[in-house]
């Protein structure tokens, strides 16, 4: 995904 995140963003 564009921009790593430790959370699942929908």
Swiss-Prot record:
Site-annotated residues for Not sulfated: 10
Origin superkingdom: Eukaryota
UniProt GO molecular function: toxin activity
Cysteines joined through disulfide linkages: none
Main location: secreted
Location of the protein in the cell: Secreted
Gene Ontology BP annotations: defense response; vasodilation
Expression sites (tissue/organ): Expressed by the skin glands.
Alphabetically ordered keywords of this record: Amphibian defense peptide, G-protein coupled receptor impairing toxin, Secreted, Toxin, Vasoactive, Vasodilator
GO cellular component: extracellular region
Known function: Produces in vitro relaxation of rat arterial smooth muscle and constriction of intestinal smooth muscle. May target bradykinin receptors (BDKRB).
Family recorded in the similarity comment: Belongs to the bradykinin-related peptide family.
Protein name listed in UniProt: Des-Arg1-[Thr6]-phyllokinin
